[in-house]
Amino acid sequence: MRRGGAALLLAAAFALGAQAQERAIPPDQLKSGSAFLGEDLRALQADEFANPGMLWVERGEKLWREPAGKKGLACASCHKEVNMRWVAARYPRIDSRSRKLLDLEDRINRCRAERMNAEPLRYESDELLALTAFLARQSRGVPIAVSIEGPARAHFEAGRTSYHQRRGQMNLSCAHCHDAQWGKRLLSETISQGHPNAYPAYRLEWQTVGSLQRRMRACLSGIRAEMLPYGAQEYLDLELYLAWRAQGLPIETPGVRR
């Protein structure tokens, strides 16, 4: 093959790659879910004394310092809070030992099992939500910055496919609402861009704190689609894709949502 032809093919490959990673919402138009709330709920989220999610953060801080498992270790035995400042903004990520994609909940449970010889915490349990909220609170204000390179690439692609896949009796995808219709009204609500940067979050409809996967399941229920069990690989892949499309938005945990 001539040099000019090879260069043309290479340029085309780069162009296709760039197009594949193109965001439906340009970075300068990214808006956190809090931007679609009324002034009262934005003020509630910003007030650390009134924000109901802070109750879970406070409980998580106690659990962080509390010994657990047969080794009698606490999370704080190994990790200093100052070193946790950036952690939540970088998850989901590939675990260097198992080479598996982990979200923050998985990371907590893996540390408990491998380092503390403690039982893993059940998904959506108050204990796991509290620890996750406490850790994510340390990253509040830090921009999301996940990696989709190397072994994370396949999970990113799977998450993107999942995001654009039509589902359920209503035959809708995540993109139909959160890419194409954001800012428009749906009954009494304004459709957000569907970013994960506030989770775990306190939702008024739940009257409690819930995880991002709980929110995903609620969306699936809303379009009458099958809900997978907590911790399913498809949810983890989708979490990575959602974090990538929210790159640059600051962590807001604990968020407040309707």
Give short role names for the model-derived ranges.
Residues R2-G5, L10-A11, L16-V57, R93-E157, ...:
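Post-cleavage N-terminal segment of exported redox proteins
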Residues A46-C78:
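N-terminal, post-signal-peptide region of Sec/Tat-exported proteins
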Residues K71-V82, L131, G159, Q169-Q181, ...:
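The canonical Cys-X-X-Cys-His
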Residues R85-R93, L186-S192:
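Short cysteine/histidine-rich zinc-coordinating motifs and their immediately flanking basic loops
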Residues R137-I144, I148-E189:
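Extended amphipathic alpha-helical interaction segments
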Residues M170-N171, G183-E189, G222-P229, G248-P250:
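Substrate-binding/catalytic groove segments of enzymes
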Residues A175-E205, V209:
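An amphipathic alpha-helical core segment
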